């Protein structure tokens, strides 16, 4: 290169999603603290006990949103194996078999261990926790990454007019992606 060049404008995928969604991501500790506030309204557990599970739950919620999964369907009571008889074409036969084995291990409510009953109690409240957590974050203008991505994707899917950052002539170059989520 023998002359000065201008660098084009660029943004990371995270920055782009934040601009498209109008939400801003928050740090993990803040998110887990907010999740605990919602969770503790339903389950009596100390923050110390919750933190490990809260981190896992936050990661699960993140994946649910990044892949545009219907949380209500996911967290429905699939202990009733008839739920698996519907249209689950997105599952392989092996996945259906594993899910059935998992839920059959619980047997009837009377034959469940204390741990299994505790798990079922939590499982049955996860959809409500998921929705309340998202509402709480939205009210504060906060979000976790998957929530940001889902909001951006839903705005675009709804044909909402969204101003994309970048070239005035509308040219965009996307680089560096390996595996994309449904939102991306």
Q: Where in this protein do the model-derived segments appear?
A:
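Conserved P-loop NTPase "ATPase switch" module shared by AAA+ and STAND
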Residues: 168-180
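Basic/charged alpha-beta structural segments of nucleotide/phosphate-handling enzymes
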Residues: 2-166, 182
